[in-house]
Amino acid sequence: MPELPEVEVTRMGIASHLKDRRIVGVLVRDGRLRRPVNEDLAELLVGQRIQALERRGKYLLLHLDQGQLLLHLGMSGSLRVLPRHTPLRTHDHVDIYLDHDQVLRFHDPRRFGLVLWGSNWFADPLLAKLGPEPFDSCFNGAYLFRRSRGRQQPVKGFLMDNQTVVGVGNIYANESLFRSGIDPRRAAGRISLARYELLARTVVTVLQEAIAQGGTTLRDFTHPDGESGYFRLSLLAYGRAGQSCQYCGNCLREVRLAGRSTVYCPHCQH
DNA sequence: ACACGATCCTGACTGC
DNA sequence: TGCAGTCAGGATCGTG
């Protein structure tokens, strides 16, 4: 489900409900995630107060008095703040009970997500190797150009690599390359500085638009408040294989790149 | 170092 | 209706 915009929409939706709340209980119904949830999570968390909810790439960091709870939504995860006695759905794997009768509930059918306690996640290999945030000034065309020299990898895979830049998954990689007129199959090392400058600006614009529209709702992604994200209506490439290009009217084509569905316009993208 | 495929897991959907 | 096959927004690991 979530790329950077969906994670950021989640963060914005729940951060104010979490700030200064005290954790009064924890229930792990199924701790078998990408890595096992800490077995003693309740002992570790109960009594601590929540200071902030921060995002780094597609990771969320819940800052508590004595450390941080690292959260990742994987492909199918979601995180909501609910009244404590809200009925359970299947795959509601972790509940963190808060004062004021609320619960922070982690839901993840495919269990590719993470819920892990630690004291310094920024030093952990999971986060330490991440590339820049797309909204940071060091993410720009010159950076992409420099980093891509000599690389034969298709530019789409290069853009989705979270050591290049964090947060750009399959949907937004497709959209950014479409809007930039760059063929996703083109070798990353053979794209000009000028085109990378356009691509970097486009990535930022696409992600910002998606956040402003509440993210992209496919299948079950909804806001923390249950609303849908409307960026799906703005998708020009992703999910539109076989339909006509909004720019030139030709038929959009689909190929698989690094195992991921890739949609592009053979006429507009080079 | 680099690029790719397989893999973790469940659910939705397709076609027979 | 049922069953097999395919695919899905991520990230890591092993391979050549």
Language model segments and positions:
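Structured catalytic/nucleic-acid-binding cores of DNA maintenance enzymes
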Residues: M1-H270
